[in-house]
């Protein structure tokens, strides 16, 4: 069983499909929020997890106290995409407006921010960016999955959805009708002068401001299926799958 940050599930599902075919192995992916994924690792409920950030020093110390040395492999660069309903022709958004909104200040540009889960990696990323510990009381909505965010935004004007970019770059067939009703926004960095969209090229050039590294964390301590899957993702075939999925391989 591998616990996967829900915001990058499409990419890891694609990896698992190829891996299982190639090695005649069975991998069970369990999508969860970042907080739940980390809890599962700490409590030994899962030996392998995919995260959208590295472990913090404090988290590494927690593991070492349990005599566990996690093997951490950086395998891709991902991006957080901001999406809005097509009824608004405006496809631009300044990051400073998002940060002001997260601080509880009203903004003409944003009617509401929609996240997949209050404990998700997208929430913790934007909270860290805005330097806030709690979400504002008004105007922030959260659901259970990136798919629900896409559906909600496609049906509600003025809302801005915060999702993993691979939900757009590798959509499932059932999501296509909803994706037709949303625009992916170009974002202006805090000290930037231009608006940049989350394309593979812009992520590669480092110009898109909401990029993040993806890691597979292995706490199994022995060379099991998890170790094999981590090696596969970081190897040639896995890196080609990353490229095909619209994200950036690390090599």
What is each of the regions a protein language model found here?
Residues 49-52, 76:
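Short beta-strand elements of ligand-binding domains
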Residues 34, 53-56:
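Residue-level marker for beta-strand->alpha-helix junctions and adjacent short loops that shape enzyme
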Residues 47-50, 159-161:
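Short, Asp-centered acidic motifs that coordinate Mg2+ and/or phosphate
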Residues 55-68:
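Hinge/lid segment of periplasmic solute-binding proteins
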Residues 1-24, 28, 34-35, 39-42, ...:
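Exported/periplasmic ABC-transporter solute-binding proteins
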